[in-house]
């Protein structure tokens, strides 16, 4: 069984995992901010040892310059590896893409939906990926990506207030507040942004009639405590590290090792 390198290049961070096609075949993982992307070569060198992967499956929504940079690094650390730049299509790994133009759907969202389907087969699911943007997508019990929402992520929401107002400061992400009705500016911003994120997820969950809500992404740890208090989501909330990567792994498992 040969190893695959999976890459999820989002707008803030590049995440990767080294896997094989077994269900529990998660061998190593790592991440770097775009500014520190050069660190990936060292991370990969350590993870690969003397056996670089022969196949790479990469989802990139961070633009062509990032893709070119990754191609150069991959050529150095895994020379000769076959690289597939994952793109949204009408159907893949048992998931049907309901976007009017399937290729327009962010490939990270399609991969996340494939991951959600793999984790909750035959169930109506909402998958919220809380990264630079927050995406909240609906997958039905028959395995169709129905559609979804895109909103500014938690960090973007907060920083847009700081950038576009005279009096509001840049806040740091923080823990759940005891009350949504804050008595100071920093907490009022945090309460507003967290409530907007959690509220959109709850609303999508209710509207879709979902039975499971998968929460992922770098901002998920801040949003999860608020969702955990939502009666609507009782017993239905599941925090999954990097659902995009889980989806790419599901594709590798579904399609197997080419001979
Ligand atoms: N150490 C960190 N560095 C950067 N962002 C972080 C960090 N910890 C949490 N975050 C939050 O996670 C978001 C990035 O999450 P991630 O899922 O990696 O996004 P993307 O897939 O868009 O690159 C940031 O916008 C921020 O809200
Ligand atoms: C919505 C996104 C910006 C999310 O990116 P991320 O927050 O993961 O960096 C990305 O999925 C994207 O560029 N989508 C293309 C448009 C669409 O999905 O309709
Ligand atoms: K996202």
Regions found by a protein language model. Give the residues of each.
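Glycine-rich phosphate-binding/hydrolytic loop that grips phosphoryl groups
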Residues: 236-259
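Glycine-rich phosphate-binding loops at beta-strand->alpha-helix junctions
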Residues: 13, 59-66, 191, 210-227
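Gly/Thr-rich phosphate-binding beta-strand-loop-beta motif of the actin/hexokinase/Hsp70
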Residues: 1-26, 116, 120-145, 161, ...
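Active-site neighborhood for divalent-cation/phosphate handling
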Residues: 82-127, 133-134
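Short hydrophobic/aromatic-enriched beta-strand-loop microsegments
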Residues: 78-85, 145-151, 232-243
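Adenine-nucleotide phosphate-binding core of ATP-dependent small-molecule kinases
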Residues: 30, 177-213, 237
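N-terminal glycine/serine-rich phosphate-binding loop of ATP-dependent small-molecule kinases
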Residues: 1-92
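Glycine-rich phosphate-binding loop plus the immediately following alpha-helix
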Residues: 105, 112-124, 146-189, 251-255
């Amino acid at each position: 069984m040969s190893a695959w390198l999976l890459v999820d290049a989002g707008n803030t961070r590049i995440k990767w995992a080294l896997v094989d096609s077994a269900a529990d075949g998660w061998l190593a993982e790592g991440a770097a901010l775009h500014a520190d992307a050069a660190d990936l070569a060292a991370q990969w060198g350590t993870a690969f040892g003397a056996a670089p992967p022969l196949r790479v499956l990469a989802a990139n929504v961070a633009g062509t310059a990032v893709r070119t940079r990754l191609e150069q690094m991959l050529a150095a650390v895994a020379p000769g590896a076959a690289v597939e730049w994952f793109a949204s299509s009408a159907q893949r790994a048992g998931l049907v893409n309901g976007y009017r133009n399937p290729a327009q759907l962010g490939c990270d969202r399609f991969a996340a939906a494939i991951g959600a389907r793999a984790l909750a087969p035959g169930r109506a699911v909402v998958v919220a990926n809380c990264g630079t943007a927050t995406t909240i997508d609906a997958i039905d019990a028959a395995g169709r990506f129905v559609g979804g929402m895109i909103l500014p992520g938690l960090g973007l929401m907060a920083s847009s207030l700081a950038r576009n107002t005279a009096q509001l400061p840049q806040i740091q992400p923080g823990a759940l507040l005891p009350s949504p009705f804050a008595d100071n500016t920093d907490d009022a911003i945090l309460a507003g942004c967290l409530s907007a994120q959690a509220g959109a997820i709850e609303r999508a969950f209710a509207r879709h009639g979902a039975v499971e809500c998968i929460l992922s992404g770098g901002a998920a740890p801040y949003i999860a405590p608020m969702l955990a208090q939502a009666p609507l989501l009782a017993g239905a909330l599941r925090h999954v590290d990097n659902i995009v990567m889980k989806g790419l792994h599901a594709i590798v498992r579904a399609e197997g090792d080419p001979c």
